[in-house]
C-alpha cells in the first residue's frame, strides 16, 4: 500500500517539476511578435500558423450562448396568461320580451310597426280568440235568462209569504238582453203558479171546512143524545117506580130500558165518529199547510238552482271577459319593437307563437357566452375577460373588457360544441372607441370572449409538450 502511494507521489512530483520549469520559460516558447505585413512575407505554412485567428466566430458563439442564457432566465421569470376562449353575443340584462298569444286567435288591429318605440302598457295588438265573441254572447244570454228565473222565483216566494201577487219591477235587475216578451212570460208564469197554489190551497181549505162542519154536526148530535139519555134516565126511573107499584106491565119497563140503552149506544157511536172526524180535521189542516210548504220548498229549490246557475254563468262570463282582455296585447316594458311577424288583418296566429319582440331601453348591455366543457373547471366568477367583437376587427377598433358575472350550474346541449355552460359577462364599457367617434354596440352582435383563468411561466409552457410526451412514453404496459 505504501509503495503504491510513493509511486503516485513520485509521478505527481515529476509532473509538477515539469510544469514549473515550463512556466518559467513560457515567454521564450512563444513565437516572436510580428506585424501583419511581416506575416504575409513568411512561407505559406508559417504564415498560416503565425497569423492569429479572427475574433468574429468567437464573438458569434459567445453571443449565441449569452442569448440562450438570457432566454432561459427570461422564460423562468416571465409569465403568460392562460386563456379560455368562449363564443357568444351581446344581450340585454333584462332579456328581450317575446310577445305570444295564449290561444289561437284572429288579428283585428295592429298598432305598431317594426322598429317603433313603445311605452310600457301601450297597446300593441288586438286579437280575437276563435269563438270568443260567440261564447261571450251565449254566456250573456244564458246569464240574462238565469237572472230572470232567479227574479221570478224570488217574486213568487214573496207572493206566497204575503198571500198576494207582487208588483213586478223589472228595472231592479240589470238584464241587457231582456225583452218585453220575456217580461210578459215571467209575469204570466208567476200568475199561473200563484193561481195554481191558491186553487190547491182552496181545495184543502174546503176539505178542512167540510171536516169542521162534520165535527160540529157530531158535537150537536152528541149533545142531543146526552140530553136524551138524561130524559130517558128519568123516564126509566119513573117506569121502574110504577112497575114496583104494579101500575104498569113489565114489558113497558123493558121497552123503556131498550130506548135508554139505544140512546147510550148512539151516543158512543157519535163520540167515536167525533174522534175520527177530529183526526180528519187535523189531517186536513196538515194537508192545507203541506200544500203551502211543498210549494215554498219547490220554489226555494228552484231559486237555489237559479242562483247557482247565475253564479256559474257569472264566473263563465268573467272568464270570457278575461279572454278578451288578454286578447289586447300590451307592451310589458318600454322599448323598441323588433322581429314583428304580424302584418295581416284577420290573419290567424297560433298558441305560443312569437308575434314580436320588445327590446327594453333601460337594460344594461352584457355578454352571454358558451364555455366549453374542457374549460369550465378553470373559469370562476370575477375573472377578467377580453371581448372581441366579430363585426369590428380588434386590431383597428380595439376590444372591450369585463368580468365573469355568473355561470350556469348545468350544461346545455349545443349541436356543434356538445355540452357547454352558459355564462354572463359584465362589461366595463358599452362602446368601442376610435379616433373618430364612439361606436355603440347593440344586442345580438357576435363576440369572442377570452377569459383569463390564470398565469404560467414561459419555461413551463415550452416544456409542457416534452413533459406530456415523457408522461405518455415512460409507462409500463
From Swiss-Prot:
Record field: transmembrane: 64-84
SUPFAM superfamilies membership: HlyD-like secretion proteins
Deleted gene: phenotype: Mutation has no effect on the levels of leukotoxin mRNA, but mutants have significantly less total leukotoxin than the parent strain.
PROSITE patterns in the record: HLYD_FAMILY (PS00543)
Membrane topology: Single-pass membrane protein
Induction trigger: Levels of toxin expression vary greatly among strains. Highly leukotoxic strains (JP2-type strains) produce more LtxA protein and ltx mRNA than minimally leukotoxic strains (652-type strains). Variations are probably due to different types of promoters.
Pfam families: HlyD_3
InterPro entries reported for this sequence: MFP, Secretion_HlyD_CS, T1SS_HlyD
NCBIfam families membership: type_I_hlyD (TIGR01843)
Protein's UniProt name: Leukotoxin export protein LtxD
Organism per entry: Aggregatibacter actinomycetemcomitans (Actinobacillus actinomycetemcomitans)
